[in-house]
Curated annotation (Swiss-Prot):
Coiled coil: none annotated. PROSITE patterns: TK_CELLULAR_TYPE. Homotetramer. It is found in: Cytoplasm. Belongs to the thymidine kinase family. It is an enzyme of class 2 (transferase). GO terms for molecular function: ATP binding; thymidine kinase activity; zinc ion binding. This is Thymidine kinase. Disulfide bonds: none annotated. It comes from Bacillus cereus (strain ZK / E33L). InterPro entries: P-loop_NTPase, Thymidine_kinase, Thymidine_kinase_CS. The gene is tdk. Zn(2+) binds at C145, C148, C183, C186.
Length: 195
């Protein structure tokens, strides 16, 4: 990262499932705490896989978080003493999240967001592409393809061990029981006609 002389910027951490996005967000938040900065972490209410009130990485690291159901609810929890605002699973927030993040950065906060940049079909997911476009720093992480061992940039959704169809619902909260990291070549998304 470069030294930034002005306060207020946006950092995006993105990638496939199991690429370490939440782990990296937690690492950055912990570093701010060592620096005696005040950080607050948010997560969408829909993300209750491991905990209702913590951001938890797949390897078990965790940090306290405020669950919110709407992007603009974040403003209710911000105080002037805050230095850093972190938001996990940003792809699950409503369309207002881009404006919320912009406003916070413009007010002088360091805003760190983490989320999937692609849905299970391999298409841009939610507001993450817009956040990547307005961010000062973008970190794109990769996992390891569970099929061949290559770098994985995609998320394979599985239903009873088989790839989910293209027109299945986009949002399905889950972990290793429903998803695997895959490379471009091992990622499969059949249409319902193919099944």
């Amino acid at each position: 990262m470069y030294l930034i002389n002005q306060n207020g910027w946006i950092e995006v951490i993105c990638g496939s499932m199991f690429s370490g996005k939440s782990e990296e967000l937690i690492r950055r938040v912990r570093r701010t705490q060592f620096a005696k900065q005040h950080a607050i972490v948010f997560k969408p209410c829909i993300d209750n896989r491991y905990s209702e009130e913590d951001v938890v990485s797949h390897n078990g690291l965790k940090v306290k978080a405020v669950p919110v159901s709407a992007s603009k609810d974040i403003f209710k929890h911000i105080t002037e003493e805050m230095d850093v605002i972190a938001i996990d699973e940003v792809q699950f927030f409503d369309g207002d999240i881009v404006e919320v993040v912009q406003v916070l950065a413009n007010r002088g906060y360091r805003v760190i967001v983490a989320g999937l940049d692609q849905d299970f079909r391999g298409l841009p997911f939610g507001q993450v592409p817009q956040l990547m476009a307005i961010a000062e720093h973008v970190t794109k992480l990769q996992a390891v393809c569970s099929a061949c061992g290559s770098p994985a940039s995609r998320t394979q959704r599985l239903i009873d061990g088989e790839p989910a169809a293209f027109d299945d619902p986009i949002i399905l909260v889950g972990a290793s029981e429903s998803y695997e990291p895959r490379c471009r070549h091992c990622h499969a998304v059949p249409t319902n006609k193919d099944k």
